[in-house]
């Protein structure tokens, strides 16, 4: 099995490993590892280029996926690192100009030439992708069969939507329901009072 780290490779440093990443995000078999390494995935985008997703492997029913990780980002990038290689200190050479590498492709993280250049200079970076809409972060969902990951979705609110927004909507719906109930109860009490007043006058 291969240990992977889900993060933004372009802003990652070896110092981050000790500070924030004491263990890998997920473990995958050879088949999934090669899919990621070779950028064998389906790319999904909405018409406004605000939300997107990457699918490695077969697409299963969405309710069968599990959210296992998420990360923030500063350069609208997402990706996977080979955790074992990073632990061994495999990274860009000491004097390598990483800014020049990223900038030379105008920060187009889906550019295949960029992906090749990155792998050539850093074996630890298995894959990079972009988060449409800017520095909005990314979510990692996995599907397992018999305990083995056979499908991965790197999602930027394309398949699963914004979790915070969903929570807010649910809260708003509950609030609306409570208001409706209170209004109905108030109307019923008002009707009862009216009936009692009418009986008393008779």
UniProtKB/Swiss-Prot annotation:
| Amino acid composition bias (Acidic residues), ranges on this chain | 165-202
Q: Where is this region: Disordered?
A: 164-202
The name this protein goes by in its record: Uncharacterized protein R816
Instruction: Identify the species of origin.
Output: Acanthamoeba polyphaga mimivirus (APMV)
